């Protein structure tokens, strides 16, 4: 499986940060292809203007239709005319791990990173297939959300992470938060590593990890527990967690 991503951005240099770590490894392995198109390169006036004042007044500037449309046209000429366009915006639906898993099978994709007060709505109506948000907060532009989505998709590609089970055991993969992790030394001040993790009993370790995952999810994200149908074993483990924590 190979992930092919195009990004429409006024700041393509920001994506140089992705050349490190897991994503950098995927790029070197040719598991990920990442290309950027700058709308400023498609502006037709001498000043290469990409924004203008909003109709109706108000603060800030709005990204213009034409430079964005031409940048998208160039991206689709390379990636394919039917390539889906995803606009990263706080007005979009909330991005979840389940959606990320879907998106890696929808490659190639074009990610549209807006700036300023937003994008001319007519561009969104004409060119955008989906709108996604990474959370209920505001950033200076869509570049960081685009990088979040690229990172989340890339780490699901087979062979990109160091261990084949790394992605499958992440938070949200099973609809639960991750369990606690420990490494050497065995004791720091008065905080030892839980003895079960030193036992070598893989069944007991798996049971402990699931119990901690269930308990941590209940403590921090009850919405995830409430939308999940717990098995008898999971409910028993959650009850044990409550007893041990009280």
Swiss-Prot record:
GO BP term, pick one: tRNA N1-guanine methylation
Protein name: tRNA (guanine-N(1)-)-methyltransferase
One Gene Ontology CC term in the entry: cytosol
Family: Belongs to the RNA methyltransferase TrmD family.
Subcellular location: Cytoplasm
Keyword S-adenosyl-L-methionine found: yes
Lineage of producing organism: Bacteria, Pseudomonadati, Pseudomonadota, Gammaproteobacteria, Legionellales
Listed Pfam families: tRNA_m1G_MT (PF01746)
Keyword Flavoprotein: no
Domain of life of the native organism: Bacteria
Species the sequence originates in: Coxiella burnetii (strain RSA 493 / Nine Mile phase I)
Subunit structure: Homodimer.
Keywords: Cytoplasm, Methyltransferase, S-adenosyl-L-methionine, Transferase, tRNA processing
Catalytic activity from the UniProt record: guanosine(37) in tRNA + S-adenosyl-L-methionine = N(1)-methylguanosine(37) in tRNA + S-adenosyl-L-homocysteine + H(+)
One GO MF term attached to the UniProt entry: tRNA (guanine(37)-N1)-methyltransferase activity
E.C. number: 2.1.1.228
Gene3D superfamilies: 3.40.1280.10, tRNA(m1g37)methyltransferase, domain 2
Sites where the protein binds S-adenosyl-L-methionine: 114, 134-139
Coiled coil (UniProt feature): none
Described function: Specifically methylates guanosine-37 in various tRNAs.
């Amino acid at each position: 499986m190979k992930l092919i991503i195009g990004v429409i951005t006024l700041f393509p240099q920001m994506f140089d940060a992705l050349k490190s770590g897991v994503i950098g490894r995927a790029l070197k392995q040719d598991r990920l292809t990442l290309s950027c198109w700058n709308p400023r390169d498609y502006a037709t006036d001498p000043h290469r203007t990409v924004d203008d004042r909003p109709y109706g007044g108000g603060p800030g500037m709005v990204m213009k239709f034409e430079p964005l449309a031409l940048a998208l046209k160039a991206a689709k000429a390379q990636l394919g005319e039917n390539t889906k366009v995803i606009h990263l915006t706080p007005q979009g639906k909330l991005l979840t791990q389940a959606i990320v898993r879907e998106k890696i099978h929808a490659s190639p994709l074009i990610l549209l990173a807006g700036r300023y007060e937003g994008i001319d709505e007519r561009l969104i109506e004409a060119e955008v297939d989906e709108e996604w948000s990474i959370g209920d907060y505001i950033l200076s532009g869509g570049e960081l959300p685009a990088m979040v989505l690229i990172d989340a998709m890339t780490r699901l590609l087979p062979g990109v992470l160091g261990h084949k089970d790394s992605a499958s055991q992440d938070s949200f993969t099973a609809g639960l938060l991750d369990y606690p992790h420990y490494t050497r030394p065995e004791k720091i001040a008065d905080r030892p590593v839980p003895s079960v993790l030193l036992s070598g009993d893989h069944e007991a370790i798996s049971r402990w990890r699931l119990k901690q995952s269930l308990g941590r999810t209940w403590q921090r994200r009850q919405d995830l527990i409430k939308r999940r149908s717990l098995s008898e074993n999971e409910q028993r483990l959650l009850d044990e967690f409550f007893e041990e924590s009280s």
